[in-house]
Amino acid sequence: MGCDGGTIPKRHELVKGPKKVEKVDKDAELVAQWNYCTLSQEILRRPIVACELGRLYNKDAVIEFLLDKSAEKALGKAASHIKSIKNVTELKLSDNPAWEGDKGNTKGDKHDDLQRARFICPVVGLEMNGRHRFCFLRCCGCVFSERALKEIKAEVCHTCGAAFQEDDVIVLNGTKEDVDVLKTRMEERRLRAKLEKKTKKPKAAESVSKPDVSEEAPGPSKVKTGKPEEASLDSREKKTNLAPKSTATNESSSGKAGKPPCGATKRSIADSEESEAYKSLFTTHSSAKRSKEESAHWVTHTSYCF
């Protein structure tokens, strides 16, 4: 069963020892990180988005993940921190003019240069192939190399001119230390947003519960600041409106009571300048009065009987 014909077996062929740890090819790892989607493992195609930890995704893959969060997907752990589409930023990438794409090696008789990248830094011109550190801004989504950020120190984006802070700078495909720092920043940012939302809710409730002071609560009379001509016209209109009301109230009061108003003197018809025929209609006229001889003493009468 072997070992014949002068063959000498070696020790490693007969004795099984511990397996050596397989070393990952760095070039292959860089190609996978910078050219393929972290979630779907497909080639990156526009629109390309990045999360708060600096990982690259296809936007349609992120939308599908958010719509169907099934536990069976093993790759869902890579995007478990993405709760909504607001947690990712669409990147503004600059194309590499030297990139030929799939047209460069259609026959398969040429060597594929893995160091050639699809995108470059718009400021310095470095290729985004993983050999150089790249970052993007959360506020605008512009992508440029870290060297450009260090060489040209400014508080404004180098490409679009938008203002940014140090917290907005996120390293793409960084090391474990970079990911830890970005994770702590992400947690602090989300906690801060929750606290702000909680403080806004009671303020909104108070504004709804409190009534409008101008409508219900009585306050001082408002002084109209306008021209004197307009003020005089308003006062005249008010007087004319109040005059008929006062006359109507006087008529109604006099009609109900049947008495002259207070302070008015009683007017006798005998003193008036009317004719004698008109005066004779009333009991106060001399023709309506009788002497004591003409009237019986035992009959009580009034002047209305005559």
Swiss-Prot record:
Gene encoding the protein: RTF2
Organism in which the protein naturally occurs: Pongo abelii (Sumatran orangutan)
Descriptive protein name: Replication termination factor 2
Keywords (A to Z) from UniProt: Chromosome, Phosphoprotein
Modified residues (Phosphoserine): S287
Main location: nucleus
GO molecular function: DNA binding
Localisation: Chromosome
Compositionally biased residues, Polar residues: 243-255
Function statement: Replication termination factor which is a component of the elongating replisome. Required for ATR pathway signaling upon DNA damage and has a positive activity during DNA replication. Might function to facilitate fork pausing at replication fork barriers like the rDNA. May be globally required to stimulate ATR signaling after the fork stalls or encounters a lesion. Interacts with nascent DNA.
